Amino acid sequence: MATQLNDLPDVILSNIIAAVTDVRSRNSTSFVCRKWLVLERSTRVSLTLRGNVRDLFMLPTCFRSITHLDLSLISPWGHPLLSPTTPDPSLTAHLLHHAFPFVTSLVVYTRHPFTLQLLPPLWPQLKQIKLVRWHQRPQLATGDEFNMLFENCPNLSSLDLSTFYCWTDDIPTALVSHPMVASNLVTLNLLNPCFSEGFKTDEIKAITLACPNLKEFRVVCMFDPRYIGFVGDEGLVAVATNCPKLSTLHLADTSALSNSRGDINDDGFTQEDAKFGVSTLIEVFSGLPLLEELVLDVCNNVRDTGPALEILNKKCPRLRSLKLGQFHGISMPVESKLDGVALCQGLESLSIRNVGDLNDMGLIAIGRGCSRLAKFEVQGCKKITVRGMRTLASLLKKTLIDVKISCCKNLGAAYSLKALEPIQNRIQKLHIDCVWDSVEEFENLDGYGYGFDLNRRDGCEASSNFGDTFGCEEDAYLFKEKKRCKFSYDLNSLYEEVNGHGNGYSGRSWDRLQYLSLWIGVGDLLTPLTAAGLEDCPNLEEIKIRVEGDCRLWSKHSEQAFGLSTLLHYPKLSKMHLDCGDTIGYAHTAPSGQVDLSLWERFYLLGIGTLSLTELDYWPPQDMDVNQRCLSLPAAGLLQECLTLRKLFIHGTAHEHFMMFLLRIPNLRDVQLREDYYPAPENDMSTEMRADSLSRFEAALNRRPISD
């Protein structure tokens, strides 16, 4: 009789099950037999609780090995988990400790400071904590909340405040007051879009001076020189001087964290220059030799940065990920000589935004020099065209699997997809803007481009055919005995001649594409997506669509539906993020000649019931004047038609009556309202947000029999 998996010794079987990280797979494993159930429960180390805090009798007690516990999504979402007004808060805290005694990493929604008083002391071995809050900061003295936290967590090594609203001066005040805790920190994440002005130079100096052992530091800064205390030479040098052990450094301007798309006609240059230059960058890079991941996302001009990036390559040999915003002169090749970021040959991920002087030649140089790139993002570069992008894709066709092209004037949807044809059978993640190029312009474009040989070494060309731009006699000498592959980059054809035999990209299938992200302007349709070049994506599983614009500038839309039925071309599509949160309109009665947001929701959701979705995240459009993002009646009616849904998360509010529509979805297991945007509404007495209303809906949902 053949040996079965269940015949393995318990120790080996336990190690196998412990190695499975996917939650659904672990749950399936636990259903095999009671023995596997016990092993799965005893080896799970991470858990996210989603039940209602009122149902403490349902708190699981079989996960005794949990070390990472996420309490931020407990229902009702955003309501205080522990506060003086909740019944028996101490009992709730002790029951959590009894169920999960070995927690070392905690995520918790902290709307009331009472949560920080009760929870952290229960786990003295707590080392990592992430605080979540989208509501207003409570009226406390500066730094009081963090003083509570640091007093109760002396062994803290990681603090994540990227989704926690507070004041910027709360943090340095508390860190300076607790030097032992601050010196133990190795990870600090302050990359929070809620900080409207970001951290100033004095605050960054105080934070880095108090935390000399940081290895990962992410912070939102104020680089704009028009503001008092802006971050310039002094602030950047302080980071490198005070925290020399950094392996991950993210410095981003406040405006860089916003979701809003820039002006496609912008030339990439701002009126003001940043108040730091190449010499400062060289000093910073020289002081951080252990850097592996660097983000410098500035919103003011940083000019002539090529020499600094060459020093970055020399001083930081471990660098693998780089993101630059508003940096100019990053790649300005002269003849065959690479420069700037193109010399960072160890990079595996590169993101560039608003590089005003980057052209096709610079883009090609990046493709030649950064030959290990698996991820490439370009945003707001108006001088690059389909020819340069297509050449880069061809140069990186063995490694590139993740691409984002956004807000580039010459790269709309069809042009972007045309440029990526050389890697269309390899790419796994893709973002494009749904700017539908003129069909006539696209078809009539002259079929000329850059033609050159790709016999190269260390980024240099071995072809005299490429003229003075990329010729390299040394490589020609080294490779003259090798097979020569000549590529010609044409908008209408791409072919490879190997000893005279063609091997082109005639198919249109994106075989490995699993994730697709789209930006689309308000009022535009999704229907041209397949005609633009994405008609065949057999393995596409997840799509994210972000709609942005002001509905108030539109009268009635001419078409009945946005075009979600177009996605029926993708047979494996099961997860969708439909983000209309940046769509602005009238929540109530609209002026004559215009329509309110309920009709816009119907426009965008019509046809969603035809898709076989199992998971949906939906952000309703908003009325900024009244800070309202509420699910409308047409939206609730259309969502109830999604008969295959198992998970539905609405990032806004909804009336209880409309929520009850969702009970008609037969296999729906998990529904939640999340106001995870700032500022989250404070009025808990409205019918859209009342805790009792949400609890009644969840109780009705849990009473239904589910087939599996």
Swiss-Prot record:
Localization terms from the record: Nucleus
Keyword line: Nucleus, Ubl conjugation pathway
Name of the coding gene: MAX2A
Residue ranges of domain F-box in the record: 2-49
Keyword Secreted set for record: no
Record organism: Petunia hybrida (Petunia)
Described purpose of this protein according to its UniProt entry: Component of SCF(ASK-cullin-F-box) E3 ubiquitin ligase complexes, which may mediate the ubiquitination and subsequent proteasomal degradation of target proteins. Is necessary for responses to strigolactones and may be involved in the ubiquitin-mediated degradation of specific proteins that activate axillary growth. Targets probably SMAX1A to degradation upon the formation of an E3 SCF ubiquitin ligase complex (ASK-cullin-F-box) containing MAX2A and KAI2IA in response to (-)-germacrene D in the stigma.
Single GO cellular component term: SCF ubiquitin ligase complex
One Gene Ontology term from the biological process aspect of the record: SCF-dependent proteasomal ubiquitin-dependent protein catabolic process
Disulphide-bonded residues: none
Protein name: F-box protein MAX2 homolog A
UniProt-listed PANTHER family: F-BOX PROTEIN MAX2, PARTNER OF PAIRED, ISOFORM B-RELATED
SUBUNIT field: Part of a putative SCF (SKP1/Cullin/F-box) ubiquitin ligase complex. Interacts with DAD2. Interacts with KAI2IA in the presence of (-)-germacrene D.
Main location: nucleus
Tissues and organs where the protein is expressed, per its UniProt entry: Mainly expressed in fully expanded leaves, lateral roots, axillary and shoot apex, and, to a lower extent, in internodes and nodes.
Alphabetical list of InterPro entries matching this protein: COI1_F-box (IPR041567), Leu-rich_rpt_Cys-con_subtyp (IPR006553), LRR_dom_sf (IPR032675)
Phenotype upon gene inactivation: Increased shoot branching.
